[in-house]
Amino acid sequence: MRHVLLIFCAIIATEALLNTGLQLKIDELFDTPGHTNNWAVLVCTSKFWFNYRHVSNVLALYHSIKRLGIPDSNIIMMLAEDVPCNSRNPRPGTVYAARAGTNLYGSDVEVDYRGEEVTVESFIRVLTGRHHPATPRSKRLLTDHQSNVLIYLTGHGGDSFMKFQDSEELTNVDLAYAIQTMFEDNRYHEMLVIADSCRSASMYEWIDSPNVLSLSSSLTHEESYSYDVDTDIGVYVIDRYTHYTVNFLTKEVKALNSSANMQDYIDSCPARKCLSNTGVRKDHYPKDVKRVRVTDFFGSSRIFQHLSEEIVLDDEFWA
């Protein structure tokens, strides 16, 4: 009888612990990121000078994720239009996302696919890893089952498609097929898909692969809008959704240890700012987005701390 009472007391004590701090620790463990590396595929699908903003969309986001630790080796950037060298550009060799901003096209920018290289086929090949054997490593998405992958698409779109080069279309079925192939080949751990175009929510309608969180700048029946026009060059320089994305990352995610979560990011561009209703699909994403850090997708998997003071290594260190 005494042993029975001891066992009963132990069970009660265990339940009490589970309902307090221990349970919180267990919950935190399940939300701990399981990835070891981060990758990004940033795609501007539009050609022509008047689509200047789609190039600056990609470049602005590129600089944000590089600031948060994702290296060029883990970023595949595709620009369908060579805006910096366009003869209409009054500031040759530059791209700006704001009238009083900084040049986004500096010497530290690495473009992997440009101009006519940016096609539906090349994009699908990047995702699936099915390249010609001579394709260099810099043009390959070398992900594995522990990779968190950010896919960002910007350009012109319609119901169930995005235009590439104004001559062909990437359909939502094409995108879903590529992501499913990635899942079957263990090419990602978790994925964030962002489509910034008109009617962009239609692009994730067919995605059924697990661990994929999908976002869009507009719903299927809505347009997506530009943000700022530069009268000196006569075109819009960034889209609203990307502007508020970069603004959020700049102000709220200043370092890799930021506590900003994905719900904060989703809420960063309400309809009063974006002028359209942003789309979210999370039925294939098992985690609570309030408990997923923004840096799980927009930053490096490793936290770096920059030191400003001088460090002197004495003889004992080298012994």
Curated annotation (Swiss-Prot):
Q: What are its GO cellular component terms?
A: GPI-anchor transamidase complex
Q: Which residues form the active site?
A: 156, 198
Q: Which residues are glycosylated?
A: 257
Q: Which family does it belong to?
A: Belongs to the peptidase C13 family.
**Keywords for this entry?**
Glycoprotein, GPI-anchor biosynthesis, Hydrolase, Protease, Signal, Thiol protease
Query: What pathway does this protein act in?
Result: Glycolipid biosynthesis; glycosylphosphatidylinositol-anchor biosynthesis
Biological process (GO), any one: proteolysis
Broad EC category: hydrolase
InterPro entries recorded: GPI_transamidase (IPR028361), Peptidase_C13 (IPR001096)
Q: What is its EC number?
A: 3.-.-.-
Which species expresses this protein natively? Answer: Caenorhabditis elegans
Q: Which residues form the signal peptide?
A: 1-16
Q: Name one GO molecular function term.
A: GPI-anchor transamidase activity
| Protein name, UniProt field | Putative GPI-anchor transamidase
- Function, as annotated: Mediates GPI anchoring in the endoplasmic reticulum, by replacing a protein's C-terminal GPI attachment signal peptide with a pre-assembled GPI. During this transamidation reaction, the GPI transamidase forms a carbonyl intermediate with the substrate protein.
